[in-house]
Swiss-Prot record:
The gene is arnT. It catalyses: 4-amino-4-deoxy-alpha-L-arabinopyranosyl di-trans,octa-cis-undecaprenyl phosphate + lipid IVA = lipid IIA + di-trans,octa-cis-undecaprenyl phosphate. Pathway: Lipopolysaccharide metabolism; 4-amino-4-deoxy-beta-L-arabinose-lipid A biosynthesis. Its EC number is 2.4.2.43. It comes from Shigella boydii serotype 18 (strain CDC 3083-94 / BS512). PANTHER family: MANNOSYLTRANSFERASE YKCB-RELATED, UNDECAPRENYL PHOSPHATE-ALPHA-4-AMINO-4-DEOXY-L-ARABINOSE ARABINOSYL TRANSFERASE. Catalyzes the transfer of the L-Ara4N moiety of the glycolipid undecaprenyl phosphate-alpha-L-Ara4N to lipid A. The modified arabinose is attached to lipid A and is required for resistance to polymyxin and cationic antimicrobial peptides. This is Undecaprenyl phosphate-alpha-4-amino-4-deoxy-L-arabinose arabinosyl transferase. GO terms for molecular function: 4-amino-4-deoxy-L-arabinose transferase activity; mannosyltransferase activity. One of its GO terms (cellular component) is plasma membrane. Belongs to the glycosyltransferase 83 family. NCBIfam families: PRK13279.1.
Length: 550
């Protein structure tokens, strides 16, 4: 009976965090709008081989993540939940692997359930796992690889070992097809410390080639298909998206070596109090094979991405699966022997909630700031933000009431965030980061436009997805579409600032021409170097400028 209650509680937890509130949040640009539009175009065109964005070749990532996103929109429609359905599914599958692997390592159902709840409630997992990017997919394949390698090395027969390594190769192959060759580097680096300490080199060398073969066979069909269709894909993807992005001096998203330290700290909420103890206990018990394995899968990817020049918080998502298992194991030990870490965790959550309440007041219309984040007419959003942090502090306090029994309620600290964050985003943020909001405000003007031009790829993708059209033209800036715009068949999809006046004269009689520009908050739009317009509609950071036929 207790198991049934636990299952009902877990399903209610998943529904409140990962299902019910998702549609209340508008899509963020540039990431969510980009991936939403790529998948929409894939469904509309029926081309499941070559990814396109705004009708242009888009080679920044392979295809598998787009497949899953497309299936999400196919099943649930072109809406906010449909766009995010794929990442939510991947996150829940990863949680299922956490459950299974914890159960296999320790044979403890309670520990397995706690590891799952900790994983799903970690701030970084929830933030990325409900956000339409490709990282939850690669995290799933990496965690699946972690489980597969363990299965292979623990098997007692050659058939079991062979099956495990073949499965490992499939997960690596799908990882390559999701986000590239990092799906090969991370598993290799993560298993080497364990193989070395356990002296399991013989099994690795005897059976490892099976993983290589199954990985190649997994990638080969699509790899050959896209090489035939687009011969320069692999050259661009390998040299530009891997070498330049991560290793060279001009790598994207450059950050210092210590970049991931604050990411780990913030991402571990509401379980931050368990982080030092989980890592220390894991190191202290390094003679235990399973502990070393989990510790290696936590630390090695973190070191790898710290050394790389290009960094983003999403890159280390897979580390938190093994970390959640270590945290759950340590938490049960602490609850039984010395609950000091659990008390510290409760106080950290109280402090975080109270700090958030104070910070919300400071940036509210009633605070001391001359330019508040929320305006007076957005009072309900301020109260939503206060509710988010109040619930966080409340559940932090509740875990202290009987810490040996109530510590696990820290999983409910982000409940207010999950339910209310979509209602608390300030209008000034929505107007710049949520193209859906802009489209809703300007729908009547946008809909009849013959041509739409914009200077932001993220906004362009949002307009294309909302209006169900892929012919948005880039104006002045090419951004990440630069490579696709270089193809001969992309001629006419970019208009420079100097060419715009002539282009306008040539196309004006064909219908309404709409220009959507991103501007600074205090920028005078009358100073823009564009021909006089027939209509201007400014929505804070985005401006709609229209030219009608003459």
């Amino acid at each position: 009976m207790k198991s049934v209650r636990y299952l009902i509680g877990l399903f209610a937890f998943i529904a409140c965090y990962y299902l019910l509130p998702i549609s209340t949040r508008l899509l963020w640009q540039p990431d969510e709008t980009r991936y939403a539009e790529i998948s929409r175009e894939m469904l509309a065109s029926g081309d499941w081989i070559v990814p396109h964005l705004l009708g242009l070749r888009y080679f920044e990532k392979p295809i598998a993540g787009y497949w899953i996103n497309s299936i999400g929109q196919w099943l649930f429609g072109a809406n906010n939940f449909g766009v995010r359905a794929g990442v939510i599914f991947a996150t829940l599958l990863t949680a299922a692997l956490v459950t299974w692997f914890t159960l296999r390592l320790w044979r403890d159902k309670r520990l397995a359930l706690l590891a799952t709840v900790i994983y799903l409630s970690l701030f970084i997992v929830y933030a990325i796992g409900t956000y339409a990017v490709l990282d939850p997919f690669i995290a799933f394949w990496l965690v699946a690889g972690m489980c597969s390698f363990w299965l292979a090395m623990q098997a007692q027969t050659w058939k079991g070992k062979s099956a495990g390594f073949l499965l490992l190769g499939i997960t690596c192959g799908m990882g390559v097809m999701t986000k590239g060759f990092l799906a090969l580097a991370v598993p290799v680096l993560s298993v080497l410390p364990w193989v070395a300490t356990q002296k399991r080199w013989k099994d690795l060398f005897i059976y490892g080639w099976l993983a290589v073969i199954s990985c190649v066979l997994t990638v080969l069909p699509w790899g050959l298909a896209i090489a035939q269709r687009e011969p320069d894909f692999w050259h661009y993807f390998f040299w530009i998206e891997h070498i330049q992005r991560f290793a060279l001096d001009d790598a994207q998203h450059r950050a210092p070596f210590w970049y991931y330290v604050p990411v780990i700290i913030a991402g571990s909420l509401p379980w931050l109090g368990l982080l030092p103890g989980a890592l220390y206990t894991g190191w202290k018990n390094r003679k235990h094979s399973a502990t070393v394995y989990l510790l290696s899968w936590t630390i090695m990817p973190l070191l790898f991405f710290s050394v790389a020049k290009g960094k983003l918080p999403t890159y280390i998502l897979s580390c938190f699966a093994s970390l959640a298992m270590l945290m759950a194991h340590y938490a049960l030990l602490a609850a039984k022997n010395n609950p000091l870490a659990l008390r510290i965790n409760g106080w950290i959550n109280i402090a975080f909630g109270v700090t958030g309440i104070i910070a919300t007041f400071v940036v509210s219309p009633w605070g001391p700031m001359n330019t508040p984040v929320w305006q007076t007419f957005e009072s309900y959003k301020v109260f939503c933000a206060w509710s988010i942090f109040s619930l966080w502090a409340f559940f932090g306090w509740y875990t202290l009431t009987n810490v040996e029994k109530t510590w696990s309620f820290a999983a409910l600290c982000p409940l207010g965030l999950a339910l209310l964050v979509g209602f608390s985003i300030p209008d000034r943020v929505m107007e710049g980061k949520h193209p859906q909001f802009f489209v809703e405000m300007t729908q009547e003007s946008l809909q009849p436009s013959r041509y739409i031009l914009t200077d932001s790829v993220g906004v362009a993708a949002g307009l294309a997805w909302s209006l169900q059209r892929d012919d948005i033209i880039m104006y002045r800036q090419t951004g990440e579409l630069k490579y696709g715009l270089n193809y001969p068949d992309a001629k006419g999809r970019f208009v420079s600032g100097d060419e715009f006046a002539n282009w306008l004269n040539q196309h004006r009689q064909e219908g309404i021409i709409t220009l959507v520009l991103s501007v600074d908050r205090d920028e005078d739009i009358n100073s823009l170097a564009i021909p006089p317009a027939d209509a201007i509609d400014r929505q804070e950071r985005l401006v709609l400028i229209q030219y009608r036929p003459k």
